Amino acid sequence: MPQKIVVVGAGPVGSLAALYAAVRGHDVEIYELRSDLRNSEHSSNISQSINLALSERGINSLRKTGLPDLADAVLAETFPMHGRMIHVRKHGQYVRQAQAYDAHGRNLLAMDRTGLNKTLLDHLNSMPNVTFFFHRKLVSVDFRKKLAWFENRTKTDPAKSDDIEVSFDLMIGADGAHSAVRYHLMKFVPMSYQQEYIDKLWCQFHVPPSDKGDFRIPPNYLHIWPQDDAMFIALPNLDKSFTSTLFLTRSGFEELVASGKVVEYFDEKFPGVVPELITEDELRKQFNEHDHFPLISIKCSPYHFGSTGVIVGDSAHAMVPFYGQGMNAGLEDVRVLFEILDKYPGDQAKALSEYSEQRTPDAQTINDLALGNYREMASDVKKPLYLLRKWIEEKLYIYVPSAGWATQYSRVTFSNMRYSEVQAAAQRQAKILNGIVGVTTLSLIGSAALWLGRTGGLQQAKQNILRSICLLAQQAQKVTKG
């Protein structure tokens, strides 16, 4: 039976939730605090956001809407990234090192968040059972009476701000990390809540195309300048520019603001950026004019109340951007939610309860993995032991497929396996991998004399490593299949 579904938040996650509901024949109303981002007047307010890395979970959620052209329309606006490109100095020389994302050649897709949002909104706009309400601020909700009150904040008539009463059968909160829906949900359900601002701020920079209209650096990579307590990244855009982001401690930003030595800092920490990618004047200008945003991590539980309210995306589990899964996880929330709602067509309360029970451990797992992945991106990627472990894992992935071996990264990024199950599998694999790394390290040491003493020694070392992997494959199979 068709219901009235109110979605609060018209970002990508809220828009996808509205599409899933509309395709099922429900009457959908979307309430958004801001103006319609498709209007030119809004463009100046949305220019700063960390670019998306769209991966399998997000793509799968787009395909499962029931709209055959949606995923293709989104994918047409993406740019493939084969792996990471690490920018470092070695022995005083600036070098770039490519690290593939996947042993089987699968890619991440760089995408502008606003472009994704516009595509979703355009599809919603063509559906007769969907109504938009922009400049509407949620001020109160009664989830028992199924009533909500919104303040009309239209710019055309600021004085006209009387609250508007709205009824609903189900409210879906997709209104971000500082969610008003979550705030009001807490009044009806004993919700556990944890919020953490990590000691990192971020600032966006724009790298324009070259004078010849081409990319300034190889385009099919996520470029990383790792510096332990700081990191600079760059993602490609379709117009051959890059969207770049500086991550730095709060005190680090304060020191740069006070000293004004942002160019000197980049020269020291991030080789090849100034003036090759950004001129000195433009770097100073963007650093001073662009906001320095905080990074927040949020966990809460449960995600619902009875049969009438549920939260998705950042409203439920805001995470730091270091695994590239925030948006993908939010889109996956929508798919999982509606699959469970379809499972219990006559019992919405049971469906929402199962959604909270299933999705909470998964969301909290990727939240933790995202926090931990900063170290990998900003530090580990330049260390020999990390590269050795990565090489071994990829060889196991290729040569022992019967063991079900896969890297944690590939399972997170290129599969739809539950995040909590990914972590459990990774922990089982780590037990055997630690042993393989130990054997491999001894093999490397034992082969060092051969490598130094005669031609072919390095190849012999690699053969010894692969032999060690094969000998341990049977044990790996037992462990990973648990």
UniProtKB/Swiss-Prot annotation:
It is found in: Mitochondrion outer membrane. Its main location: mitochondrion. GO terms for molecular function: FAD binding; kynurenine 3-monooxygenase activity. Its cofactor is FAD. The keyword Glycoprotein does not apply. The keyword Mitochondrion applies. Coiled coil: none annotated. Pathway: Cofactor biosynthesis; NAD(+) biosynthesis; quinolinate from L-kynurenine: step 1/3. InterPro entries: FAD-bd (IPR002938), FAD/NAD-bd_sf (IPR036188), Kynurenine_monooxygenase (IPR027545). Its EC number is 1.14.13.9. It comes from the Eukaryota. It catalyses: L-kynurenine + NADPH + O2 + H(+) = 3-hydroxy-L-kynurenine + NADP(+) + H2O. One of its GO terms (biological process) is L-tryptophan catabolic process. Keywords: FAD, Flavoprotein, Membrane, Mitochondrion, Mitochondrion outer membrane, Monooxygenase, NADP, Oxidoreductase, Pyridine nucleotide biosynthesis. Catalyzes the hydroxylation of L-kynurenine (L-Kyn) to form 3-hydroxy-L-kynurenine (L-3OHKyn). Required for synthesis of quinolinic acid. Belongs to the aromatic-ring hydroxylase family. KMO subfamily. This is Kynurenine 3-monooxygenase. It comes from Phaeosphaeria nodorum (strain SN15 / ATCC MYA-4574 / FGSC 10173).
